[in-house]
Regions:
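Flexible loop/turn segments at secondary-structure boundaries
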Residues: 92-93, 123, 187, 195-196, ...
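PRPP-dependent phosphoribosyltransferase catalytic core
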Residues: 169, 184, 221-227, 381-492
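Generic beta-strand/beta-sheet core signal
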Residues: 116, 181, 189-190, 201, ...
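Phosphate/diphosphate-binding loops
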Residues: 167, 215-216, 220-224, 231-232, ...
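Secondary-structure transition/capping motifs at alpha-helix termini
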Residues: 136, 157-158, 293-297, 315-322, ...
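Conserved short alpha-helical segments that host acidic/polar catalytic motifs at enzyme active sites
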Residues: 1-230, 235-238, 242-296, 302, ...
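Short, glycine/charge-rich flexible loops or terminal/linker lids adjacent to PRPP-binding catalytic cores
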Residues: 318-363, 374, 401-407
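A conserved beta-strand->alpha-helix junction
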Residues: 140, 145-148, 321-332, 429-447
Length: 492
C-alpha cells in the first residue's frame, strides 16, 4: 500500500470473517484478529461490518486498543451482522492521515464495498493519472483508493463483483493481497506473483476467515485451511455459504513471495505457505553457523525477530544460547517508526542488556537485518558498555542493497548502509569484531515446505516487475509537492 505523498512503502495486515452459524460477534472477532496482526501495522486501523447487507465501519489513526474503545466496538456489534473486515496499517511520517486508513468503504449505484489491501502497486501512478483524467477525485494518497475506483468502475459495467475484480487484476501490477466485502460476499484476492501472504481458515460453527497470517486465525478460533494461491480469487457467497475458487482468469508468472515475511515481518507462531515462521528463522540461524562459524562463549538474539535465528545458530554451533536483552514491551518496532530520529530515540529505551549474560564473554549477536545501520551500531555499543569481550554480529538475511516497491518500508538506496559498501566497510560503521550475512543461496531455502519461489530483489536488485513507474512521474512529483509542509523525508 504505497503513498504518493511520501516516497516510502509500508506493511499492513488484512482480515475478513463470515460467520455462517450466526453465533459470532464478528466485530469482536475482527478486533481480536487485528490485535494478533498489530505487528504488521501500528499507525492506523479499522473495522467494517455487514449487517444484513448494510456496511458500516470505523477507522482512525492509532493502535487497535486506542481506536476501538469499548464504546466504539459496541457500536459495531450487532446480533444480525455475520460478516466483517479489518485492517492494520503502517505508513511513513507525513502520511498519517485518516483518509488513508482502511477498510475503505465505497458506495456506488450497484451496492457497497469495503476493501482492505496489503501490498504496493508498481503502476499506481499511471492508473491514478488515468482515473483523474476521467474525472475521478481522490481523497487520500494511497494506492488502495486506485484499486477501489477500478473495481467500482468495472462493477458498474459487469454482472458480479468477482468479475469486476478479475477485470481489475488485468491492469494491476505489483503486490496486492485484498479482502473485499460486499452486501452478500466475502472475497480474498492475491496477486499473480503472491508477494504478500493471505490464508483461509474455517470456523467451528461454519464459515470462513481470511487473514494475512495464521496467527489471526488462532485469535478467532478458526482452523487453518490453506493459503490463497497466487492469482486466485476466493469467493464466499453468504446466500449459499459455499467457498468458490477462481483461478483461470490471469497468467501464471513465477511466484515471488516476499522472503522478508519469514525473516522479519510475520509472527513466529504463524504458518505461511505450509512452513512455520519459527522453524524458518531457526533454519536461518543454522545456515549462519555453517557459513560464518566463530569461537564464542554465548549466542544471543535481538528481540524479537532475532531470537529464533539465534537459537538455530546455537543449536548448530554448540555454543550456549543466552538471554542477552530485556525488551521494553511498550515501544514499537524500530523498523516500523515514522522517522530516522524516532528510530534512534526508540533504540535507547527499547533494549537493556542482561550484563550477567555477556560480561567478559565472547558474544555472537544475531539479528534479522541491517538496513540503515544505526540500530545495529547502538546495540553493539550497549553490549560493549555492559562488558562484552567480543561481539560477533551475524545477520539472518543478505545485505539490503536495493529499495522495495512491493510493500516493505525499505528506503531508497542512499539510506541503505550496504549500498556501495562491502562487509568490512559496513562492519567499520557498526563496530562489531566480525560481521557475517546469510547468503542469497541459503535465504531462499529457509522455508523448506513452502511450494513457492521468493522475491529477493532488495538483496539482488533483480525485480520481477520493473519499478520505474514509481520512481519518476509528474503525478508523483505533484503529490510530493502537495504533502504537508512539516512532513520530512526519512533521514532529514
Amino acid at each position: 500500500m504505497s503513498d504518493f505523498a511520501y516516497p516510502l512503502h509500508e506493511e499492513c495486515g488484512v482480515f475478513g470473517i463470515y460467520d455462517r452459524a450466526g453465533t459470532e460477534d464478528v466485530a469482536a472477532a475482527a478486533y481480536s484478529a487485528l490485535y494478533a496482526l498489530q505487528h504488521r501495522g501500528q499507525e492506523s486501523c479499522g473495522i467494517a461490518v455487514n449487517d444484513d447487507g448494510v456496511i458500516t465501519g470505523h477507522r482512525d489513526l492509532g493502535l487497535v486498543n486506542e481506536v476501538f474503545t469499548p464504546e466504539v466496538l459496541a457500536s459495531l456489534s450487532t446480533t444480525t451482522a455475520h460478516m466483517a473486515t479489518g485492517h492494520v496499517r503502517y505508513a511513513t511520517a507525513g502520511t498519517r492521515v485518516r483518509a488513508n486508513a482502511q477498510p475503505m468503504i465505497v458506495r456506488h449505484g450497484r451496492g457497497t464495498m469495503a476493501l482492505c489491501h496489503n501490498g504496493n502497486l508498481t503502476n499506481a501512478v499511471e492508473l491514478r493519472r488515468q482515473l483523474e483524467n476521467e474525472g475521478a477525485i481522490f481523497h487520500g494518497s494511497s494506492d488502495t483508493e486506485v484499486i477501489c475506483y477500478l473495481i467500482t468502475r468495472n462493477r458498474l459495467r459487469m454482472g458480479s463483483i468477482e468479475t469486476a475484480i478479475s477485470k481489475t487484476m488485468d491492469v494491476l501490477e505489483g503486490a496486492y493481497s485484498l479482502v473485499i466485502m460486499s452486501a452478500t460476499k466475502l472475497i480474498a484476492v492475491r496477486d499473480p506473483r503472491g508477494y504478500r501472504p493471505l490464508c483461509i481458515g474455517t470456523l467451528p460453527g461454519g464459515g470462513y476467515v481470511f487473514a494475512s497470517e495464521s496467527c489471526a486465525l488462532d485469535a478467532t478460533g478458526a482452523a487453518l485451511l490453506r493459503d490463497v494461491e497466487p492469482g486466485e480469487i476466493v469467493v464466499v457467497d453468504t446466500k449459499t455459504g459455499e467457498l468458490r475458487s477462481i483461478k483461470d482468469h490471469c497468467g501464471r508468472p513465477d511466484t515471488q513471495m516476499c522472503v522478508f515475511e519469514f525473516i522479519y515481518f510475520a509472527r513466529p507462531d504463524s504458518v505461511i505457505e505450509g512452513s512455520s515462521v519459527h522453524e524458518a528463522r531457526k533454519q536461518a540461524g543454522r545456515f549462519l553457523a555453517q557459513e560464518h562459524p566463530v569461537e564464542a562463549d554465548v549466542v544471543i538474539g535481538v528481540p524479537d525477530s532475532g531470537l529464533d535465528a539465534a537459537l538455530g545458530y546455537s543449536q548448530e554451533s554448540g555454543i550456549p544460547y543466552g538471554i542477552g536483552f530485556i525488551k521494553n514491551k511498550y515501544i514499537g518496532r524500530t523498523f516500523i517508526q515514522g522517522s530516522q530520529k524516532q528510530r534512534e530515540n526508540s533504540v535507547r529505551i527499547k533494549l537493556n542488556v542482561v550484563s550477567s549474560t555477556v560480561k567478559g564473554k565472547r558474544v555472537v549477536l544475531v539479528d534479522d537485518s541491517i538496513v540503515r545501520g544505526t540500530t545495529s551500531a547502538r546495540i553493539i555499543k550497549l553490549l560493549r558498555d555492559a562488558g562484552a569481550k567480543e561481539v560477533h554480529f551475524r545477520v539472518s538475511a543478505p545485505p539490503f542493497k536495493y529499495p522495495c516497491y512491493f510493500g516493505t518500508d525499505i528506503p531508497d538506496q542512499k539510506l541503505l548502509v550496504a549500498t556501495g559498501r562491502n562487509v568490512e566497510q559496513i562492519n567499520e560503521i557498526i563496530g562489531a569484531d566480525t560481521l557475517g550475512y546469510l547468503s542469497t543461496e541459503h535465504v531462499v531455502q529457509l522455508a523448506k515446505n513452502a511450494k513457492c519461489g521468493f522475491c529477493t530483489a532488495c538483496f539482488t536488485g533483480e525485480y520481477a516487475v520493473e519499478p520505474e513507474s514509481v520512481l519518476s512521474t509528474d503525478i508523483h512529483d505533484r503529490h510530493l509537492n502537495d504533502r504537508p509542509k512539516d512532513a520530512k523525508k526519512l533521514g532529514e
